[in-house]
């Protein structure tokens, strides 16, 4: 039974066991490292993500815009050679689940958590494995590499860079939630929220 608002749906026949799963589980991955992941899309003042018809990545406001480190840490993963062509080979996931993100950076922070920045622009990485970074440092540019339909930044925090990683919640500071006209000093961002950075 699934509850949505005031409607209840009888989705399954009675007396059966079901388990939710993600498509990548068939490739040997059984954890939910994207449980608290975000896809950030840059908008104009009219909340549009692109100009024209959006047929080219160049039409998108976010394409080639700077990406900054969310916190101090050390680069533990860096991939820079995926094309910005929306191509993705799902069979590579078993060897490396980070293939989902195309060009990608993983930064390990003092508490052990790792922040992931995915779908970065080919050859835009300004850091490499082993580099130390500081919060707010420019590290790359937004692209459309990996399993991406349009230019955006995939951001998540996880327990490990390896396959057994679990997703961790992210807290954001100094942003405005435009729908509620409220400043968020520190807290969560809801999926679908439009926020203004300050």
Task: Describe the function of each predicted region.
Residues 67-78, 126-141:
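Short, well-structured beta-strand-loop connectors
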């Amino acid at each position: 039974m699934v509850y949505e608002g005031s409607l209840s749906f009888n989705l399954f026949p009675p007396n059966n066991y079901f388990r939710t799963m993600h498509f990548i589980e068939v490739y040997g991955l059984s954890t939910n490292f994207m449980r608290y992941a975000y896809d950030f899309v840059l908008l104009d003042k009219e909340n549009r993500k692109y100009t024209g018809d959006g047929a080219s990545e160049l039409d998108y406001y976010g394409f080639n815009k700077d990406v900054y480190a969310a916190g101090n840490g050390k680069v533990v993963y860096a991939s820079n050679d995926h094309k910005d062509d929306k191509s993705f080979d799902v069979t590579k996931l078993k060897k490396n689940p980070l293939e989902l993100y195309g060009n990608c950076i993983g930064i390990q922070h003092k508490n052990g958590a790792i922040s992931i920045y995915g779908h970065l622009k080919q050859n835009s990485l300004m850091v490499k494995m082993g580099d130390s970074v500081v919060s707010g440092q420019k590290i790359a540019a937004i692209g459309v590499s990996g399993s991406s339909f349009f230019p955006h930044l995939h951001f998540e925090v996880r327990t490990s860079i390896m396959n057994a990683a679990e997703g961790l919640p992210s807290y954001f500071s100094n942003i405005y939630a435009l729908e509620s006209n409220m400043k968020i000093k520190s807290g969560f961002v809801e999926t679908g929220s439009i926020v203004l950075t300050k």
